[in-house]
Amino acid sequence: MKAMPWNWTCLLSHLLVVGMGSSTLLPRQPPQLSQKPSFVTFRGEPAEGFNHLVVDERTGHIYLGAVNRIYKLSSDLKVLVTHQTGPDEDNPKCYPPRIVQTCNEPLASTNNVNKMLLIDYKENRLIACGSLYQGICKLLRLEDLFKLGEPFHKKEHYLSGVNESGSVFGVIVSYSNFDDKLFIATAVDGKPEYFPTISSRKLTKNSEADGMFAYVFHDEFVASMIKIPSDTFTVIPDFDIYYVYGFSSGNFVYFLTLQPEMVSPPGSTTKEQVYTSKLVRLCKEDTAFNSYVEVPIGCERNGVEYRLLQAAYLSKAGAVLGRTLGVRPDDDLLFTVFSKGQKRKMKSLDESALCIFILKQINDRIKDRLQSCYRGEGTLDLAWLKVKDIPCSSALLTIDDNFCGLDMNAPLGVSEMVRGIPVFTEDRDRMTSVIAYVYKNHSLAFVGTKSGKLKKIRVDGPKGNALQYETVQVVDSGPVLRDMAFSKDHEQLYIMSERQLTRVPVESCGQYRSCGECLGSGDPHCGWCVLHNTCTRKERCERSREPRRFASEMKQCVRLTVHPNNISVSQYNVLLVLETYNVPELSAGVNCTFEDLSEMDGLVIGNQIQCYSPAAKEVPRIITENGDHHVVQLQLKSKETGMTFASTSFVFYNCSVHNSCLSCVESPYRCHWCKYRHVCTHDPNTCSFQEGRVKLPEDCPQLLRVDKILVPVEVIKPITLKAKNLPQPQSGQRGYECILNIQGIEQRVPALRFNSSSVQCQNTSYSYEGMEINNLPVELTVVWNGHFNIDNPAQNKVYLYKCGAMRESCGLCLKADPDFECGWCQSPGQCTLRQHCPAHESRWLELSGANSKCTNPRITEIIPVTGPREGGTKVTIRGENLGLEFRDIASHVKVAGVECSPLVDGYIPAEQIVCEMGEAKPSQHAGFVEICVAVCRPEFMARSSQLYYFMTLTLADLKPNRGPMSGGTQVTITGTNLNAGSNVVVMFGSQPCLFHRRSPSYIICNTTSSEEVLDMKVTVQVDRARIRQDLVFQYVEDPTIVRIEPEWSIVSGNTPIAVWGTHLDLIQNPQIRAKHGGKEHINICEVLNATEMTCQAPALALGPDHQSDLTERPEEFGFILDNVQSLLILNKTNFTYYPNPVFEAFSPSGILELKPGTPIILKGKNLIPPVAGGNVKLNYTVLVGEKPCTVTVSDVQLLCESPNLIGRHKVMARVGGMEYSPGMVYIAPDSPLSLPAIVSIAVAGGLLIIFIVAVLIAYKRKSRESDLTLKRLQMQMDNLESRVALECKEAFAELQTDIHELTSDLDGAGIPFLDYRTYTMRVLFPGIEDHPVLRDLEVPGYRQERVEKGLKLFAQLINNKVFLLSFIRTLESQRSFSMRDRGNVASLIMTVLQSKLEYATDVLKQLLADLIDKNLESKNHPKLLLRRTESVAEKMLTNWFTFLLYKFLKECAGEPLFSLFCAIKQQMEKGPIDAITGEARYSLSEDKLIRQQIEYKTLVLSCVSPDNVNSPEVPVKILNCDTITQVKEKILDAIFKNVPCSHRPKAADMDLEWRQGSGARMILQDEDITTKIENDWKRLNTVAHYQVPDGSVVALVSKQVTAYNAVNNSTVSRTSASKYENMIRYTGSPDSLRSRTPMITPDLESGVKLWHLVKNHEHGDQKEGDRGSKMVSEIYLTRLLATKGTLQKFVDDLFETIFSTAHRGSALPLAIKYMFDFLDEQADKHGIHDPHVRHTWKSNCLPLRFWVNMIKNPQFVFDIHKNSITDACLSVVAQTFMDSCSTSEHRLGKDSPSNKLLYAKDIPSYKNWVERYYSDIGKMPAISDQDMNAYLAEQSRMHMNEFNTMSALSEIFSYVGKYSEEILGPLDHDDQCGKQKLAYKLEQVITLMSLDS
């Protein structure tokens, strides 16, 4: 093995000092919660991200796979060993990698990403797979990471070139006595032909063994792997399967995957790509992958679908969760994290869910599906693996839990999704990883998130819900990667992000400070260690097994009560009794502590503890501001641990704080009020005498509630107050006073206590400032002895008032509150109290008086001042003295001489009247408003100064006059006097138009929605006037949006969007909207015409914490087009917001200094949005000062040609809706120069001129070169164009000429039919050359007689219908009786019954009838009958037709079939055929078409006949690009034109000799020493290689041993064409179902690959240089058409012959008519009248069972050789034939397979032929059984002795031997069999045949 090119270095003891954080906390001072916990972390090399993590369960060591390195770490994350894995020179396109053979791709230093890391415990090694060299793996020793092996030289060693660390998963399956297996599942990154997506490999004991990673099983057809077929990529170009997790359980290995799928959203016909999460299951022992099943998984909560798998982990259920789910504690559960939706794989949405799956339920679902599939229900449902739907086949099997599949019905997909149980959802911080375990029967999950947090979740939380009990930030920046692992003891958890590995304790109980917090946290690890007063695990609490020392439930927490629980601050050394609950025994003693006041010993008596309160010097002074009490914690401290273990609140109260009686006695403590001393005390004995003590609130001195106390200003008046318990002042105490606080000024008034319940403030007058307040509430306090307050609990106030304030008119005065006793004093004309109105001079009006009407009403304003004559206008009249009651004005209002009826609702006494106008006469035009108040006397009448006018309203026009049906159009109606009146109603037909505003010349209203498209008459009603005018508004269909472009913007919006739609011009102010995170942004649009508008994209509302470089999709995106609801949210758009461009500031100072003319560069990122479609630009404007500059944009910078400015200017960049100034630019002017500077510049200038001249000369030369290059490119383009045109022209010309040539060529050749025996053998036993039924029975002589006797007896039994039917049915019911066996038995029975065809037909009919019954019983679709050969009857039917249609073939159908075969062969051979891939220039099959231009010439060689040297030379047409073998075959075809194939010499046995003029002879060969080898490709020799000219003479001679140019013999044999065909057919992929790409496998010894005309394109070896000779390969598909046209006549002839009832005088074979009648009979019997079903039965029975076989395999009928290209073309014809017999419609599109498209136009007419054929047969007279039997007897007689019946019987008997008991069983039980003693006879046969008899 050649030395590896890596420079491996093993860095031992490479210790990194990491942030050391202790995980065990000291019990005394747990850290404060505010501190961020510090964890042990490890950070690798800055440039290398971490990928994978695995912990050795035995040693606890950690293995960390990173980019370019593998680390081995100790459990506290110290580096023990590192092993370097990269970088190295590589190119992902090098396959095989450059370490195996040289690679022509450019190499670059490439990182090695760790894709898989597994511990192989059995062999003590680490398997580490990387991304370099197509994904090779290393095996490293666990101890020191020493490299044990690194297999890289075989295909199997390349796992996949994919570069992502998270897309590969491996599972090791271990065996005790032989080598382990490794199941590997990987994404393939678009290279499915190189890498299987899932496979099982050998893990050999020896790490350097050759078989390491070899497939567990591999032969020509089957292997332990599955590849993604290349066809899948045509449907989904970026298809891949991403593997998220894998594990083994029971007999199975499981993988969880994410894969793209095309689905149609509900209600849509177009398909869109989504991602589906699936579980894949395989049997551990399955080598052929028949057990592959895949099931979609997902979960849903509250209507939200979570379908994108993020991570998963397998764990056990645990007892608590098990009970909830109904499973056993040790059943497997799968914990999974999904994110919302199905749309995006990489940028998942943040909403995510934790779901659990019960593995057993998934397995049960798979078992159900397997059972239904083996009943024949449904299809295999695996879109990516089977491009078309393959139906399930039924088979009688019992499928148990461990069923591992057969080669049928596999691989299988389950279409129905298995839904997980959602236990927890998170909407903001996406969950990205999960790990779980069971702790003390509780099931716990630990989930990592996008932001680097760890969520701890108790899945079996209280009430059956999951409980998230803790969240910790564990890595600095997220996301947390999928791989998480527990330490060996499960006490620590290792968590990593791309840059950091952290060790986190599984629990952090120490953070909880109290028993309640600890046990309320929900963490099942935590309990309360009582005497140590800490929260901890039970095992860490001392003596936790003793009673009451460890609390694990809330009710076990310690409780403490104290009696008494409060004392006054002035009480000392009081005895306190403490009662304790849940306390352990306290024999060691206990202390009582009053916080930091005092500490003393407690006396323990049972569960009571006695303590004393603190002494005088220790009691706190309770400060007044803090209220009347002070709470301290009374704590109990254990003397054993020195820790406080219980505490309760204890109160010191202070009564003296209270200074009012009510607050004192209402205090919760024992406070008393001393009434005469006015103090509060805890000791009632200190009150001066007994009556003075107050304990109850009702005994307190206090004022009682009174109604409003009204005091007019400036009036002298006493205030009397009610009270109770007023104390009598004692000697030496002062009397009572009232204190009023008026506008901040205290006014004290002496007061008089009448008795204990009454007090009066003395006569005084009061006043306050200003006339803005007409009454003022004033605080009132009653005191005695100067400052002893009397409590005022009702908070009585005194109201001071002024009558004149804010009541300027008589009406307003009389409206005032009657309690004020205000009235109107007329002579000064003001509002006063009565005593202030001079009585002799004037009248005083008051409301209650008889004369209470105000005179002189006045009108100040009327609204509106115009109205229609018709009336109905509501006129509002405002003024003074307009009556005090409604009845005063109810009938006395006239407006412009017209009655106006007042309305109660609008009346405000004295101030406002609203009345409704009556109709005016035509003569009335204008007038004043006149009113009378109550009576119409002059002093009670008023007239307005404004005039009211009657108007005539007219309408002129409306704009716009059409709008959408949904409404919302703002319509302007123009006219005159449109502001008259009070109320406007606009109607469009019956739809209201909502009034908006108006002026004299217009009314604006908004339309409402209409149900239909209509023209509506416009009516406007103003009050009672209907304005008539023929205006029409047209409701038009709502606008629609057809498409928008581009479908993206940036987050700040304001980029232009072009919108196309219909009826867009209806909308006046269209707007575009986007809603995100519940916030909506709107922007404007401008309509260009009915179908186009341009909009400015709305911004996207993003929160401040949004990550700026993510792509976003708005929740809603749409348009606000008036009221059109349907466009508010566009469903079919995928509008995307890319991150805003971000600019950097010029420098920290923000100033950039430049020379004039230097461009300004603005650096940034996201300057070009990463749109999928390619070149998109944003429109940038950059202003320097005021001047714009021209901008060039790249992704990370803007280049701005600085304008012609000097000095300092601000730079401003604008794009979309954002502006940014990176700073100022300072452009320095050029400075004047000194003399030396000028001299030196002159010198430099001279040199520069010389230099420039030199440059110009060089430039001239260079530009000439580039001109040439341009011309060359131009020529190449022209060349390509002309070649495409030529190709099309050529194809057309060929089509016209070839048809004629072919038809003339084919005449006259005899048809080499096979004889009857060979023909039947090839159909009955395909592929078996010398079958026993053709030979005599071979038995040893001594047994011959017995055996013959036994077989004769057996023949009698076979001829017994009851026995034969029973025999066949029994065999068919055996599970091990395979499809091949069924076919074999059917053929053997038919050979035995060849001489008794009547009986055979009878049995066949019986079996078919049974089959039809069974088919209909099992509810299969009736059309499936006879579709596939799954029973003996179906194969017998084929054989029956084979026997009976031989004559028809020979006389009739054989000729067109042979002609078609010859035509195809000739047509193919007219053009080049690749000897290795089998592709040809002319083909009907797209797969076998050479898609390149191959230059070739036709040569005519003269060939000497090998048989007769003297016969004339035969001219043979060949091509100069033919290989030598191809030439030999063409020569043989020409010379032995009429000789059957089997009688001709083989090309491989002949040599081709070129006889040159000089008599020299040269042997030509496919490979010899002259063969050209180039870059590992060896090209087969062609005629052109030897430069054989046209007209040369060649001869075929028998093979020579050597020749001068021969190559060693081992390779000579390789040159036969069939060998290459085999090579193509079977290499590269184990089974044509799984991948259809041939792969030319290089010889592993030499690494050389053969080619002929085209290199196999999978190898990508065509270099860039070959581009010139390539053309778009699809151009060549026109050749299919040319070939089809050429062969059309022959296809038509064949189909016409087969589908006509009378052809060239040959009648329809009786067998066909007889069988079709039988099928019709059966259909009638079962009541099937669907013509499609009958048609299908007939098609399945004859065309599909017989004719298709003959068309595809003409070698069954003729003695010919069929090569692979002819085979491919015949397959296309056969497919067309099948399509013609089908009744279903084929929908074709541009993606349909080419063979369907090729004959799409012809198939309908062929279908008509088939229908006509079937109906003609139906109309023919029925064949009587007599006639039929006579015909069958004749057939039997003709072919009586073709087969050896004895040998056939012996073959059949072998099945009796195999299933003797099963066959005898039914014979014993059946009555008929019993009567005929069939069981006994069979036993006789068995006895005779047995060996030992």
UniProtKB/Swiss-Prot annotation:
Residues 1258-1893 are cytoplasmic. Residues 1-23 form the signal peptide. It is a single-pass type I membrane protein. Belongs to the plexin family. The chain crosses the membrane at residues 1237-1257. Residues 24-1236 are extracellular. This is Plexin-A4. GO terms for cellular component: cerebellar climbing fiber to Purkinje cell synapse; plasma membrane. Residues 857-951, 953-1036, 1039-1138, 1141-1229 form the IPT/TIG domain. Residues 24-506 form the Sema domain. The modification N6-acetyllysine is found at residue 1349. It is found in: Cell membrane. Glycans are attached at residues 654, 1006, 1131, 1179. Residues 508-558, 654-701, 802-855 form the PSI domain. SUPFAM superfamilies: E set domains, GTPase activation domain, GAP, Plexin repeat, Sema domain.
